Amino acid sequence: MTSVVSVVERLPVVVGVDGTPADLQVVDTAAEEAAFRGVPLHVVHAWPGRLVSWSRHRAAADQPDGRHLLELAIRRVQLAYPSLVVGTQLVDEGAAEALVRWSARAGLLVVRHRDEAGLGHGWGSTAAYVAHHSVCPLLVHRGAVPSRGPVAVAVSGRHTASLRSAFEAAARAGCGVTAVHVREAGGDTGDRLDTALAEWADQWPDVPVDRLVIDEDEVAYTIDRASRRCRLLIAGRGRKGWSVEAVYNSGGVAGGRQLCPVLLVPPGWPVGGRVPAEASRPAGY
């Protein structure tokens, strides 16, 4: 009988591209993740197609452009990672819906921010929608990844996949972990927090750990500071999506400064990084 673990651990890294020059950077990020994990990379591009009913000529012109973009992405990835298996998909549907559908069959979904409305949070409607609905962990690329600083992770004191992800990322980058905990009114989760941190610290003894306990009114400031000073910001999405709102409504791209990537882990994502057996490879992959 085929092992479920052996199947699900081969789920690909999926990256969404929309046809702009900045997409090359996000493809690079996704390729690095896929190569590190030893899994295939799949590049997904949504083109207007039938959604642009007012201009058949424009829709027909977009499809070849989309195919050309995917060909460029494949060549770029294969130059950097010759042995990496790369697949592509040109889909005739909305980008947000397509990416959420693919997230049910991926181990990691990668998108870039796009401040298309000038809102200041640097995400854009597609990334914001996917952040709330992605089935797998979502990595939001927000510019050049800083080469210094720790990995910051929001922790609750529970045994979660986001905390494991933080230690794995820090060990890979050769840096420390800053565990940020929001103090609960009238409660003390210090012992639980210490236990959760100690468990992963035992597995990664070379990763330094700093603990930062803040009040609720300090969340926005802390996220903004972490976005500018850390290599990676990790948070569990939560069942109500409040952490997503906190991340993309805090900070932004003020002054044109680059912000670190954000990794959002959905509720219920297994601590070992494994997904349910029904999450299978997309048709045509």
What are these regions (language model features)?
Residues V110-H113, P137-G143, V262-P266:
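Short beta-strand elements of ligand-binding domains
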Residues A35, L41-V43, Q63-L70, A106-R114, ...:
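Conserved N-terminal glycine/acidic-rich loop preference
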Residues M1-V8, A22, H57, Q78-L109, ...:
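Structural beta-alpha unit
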Residues S125-A144:
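Short, structured interface segments
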Residues T2-H57, R148-G190, L197-L212, L232, ...:
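Small/aliphatic-rich secondary-structure junction motif
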